[in-house]
Amino acid sequence: LYPCDVKTRDAYANMDVAGYNYGIKRYRHDLKKYPKRMILGSETFCADAYQFMQEAKRDKRIIGDFVWAAQDYLGEVGIGAWEYKDYAPRFDGGCGWVSAGSGRIDLTGKPLGEMTYTRVAFELEDLAIAVVPVDHTKDAHSPSAWKMTNAMESWSWDGCEGKAAKVEVYTRADHVKLYINGECVGTKKPKNDCKVFFDTTYHNGEIKAVAFDANDNVIAEKTLATAGKETVLRAEPELTRVNADTDLCY
């Protein structure tokens, strides 16, 4: 590890808590070197949630974690966005890009895949399923370290019957089985994180994950189902008038 503590050791010695930005790989090293130090993750990646929880359980001197970002926001356009060529041909964050694209919650307040993952990593839920947009399963997207996944809790992909699908399952269980319309399509064990990936084929109907302990006892089940033909979407604006280019219309 680079000895960057030559710049911080004197300052941190006079502080109650040391704030670390994207420094989770230093936690163990620095706590061993400075036994009286208290560490707070003052800015971290969404993908570090599981590792943070494991470190915090191991050492009570790690007292908290602030992720960038909790909710998407205006500005820093595209810094945390995963967009595809059909929507953003240049991946340059230029004209047409509005928000950062980063966050466990989107601009409308909807929890995203990162939030789902975090709840499992923090032991608030036992199991969750998220699906990468099936119409873009194998497509390249804009790069960003501030987004962990664009998978969502949906098994409704109209026009994608028979296409390749990538399913993410989040669990702390010993192993998990994935079923599509009652047929088991695979069994996997989480390794150094609480997520596993299944490459499968999309079929309308039902997808179910079943989590097991080491003795093959069922811990939890989670199911997603395809929306029926009667399902419709309706948009109702909160305001009847907004300013062009400056206001958001909810």
Residue ranges and their predicted role:
Residues 10-247:
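Substrate-binding clefts and catalytic carboxylate motifs of secreted carbohydrate-active enzymes
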Residues 1:
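Catalytic cores of extracellular degradative/oxidative enzymes
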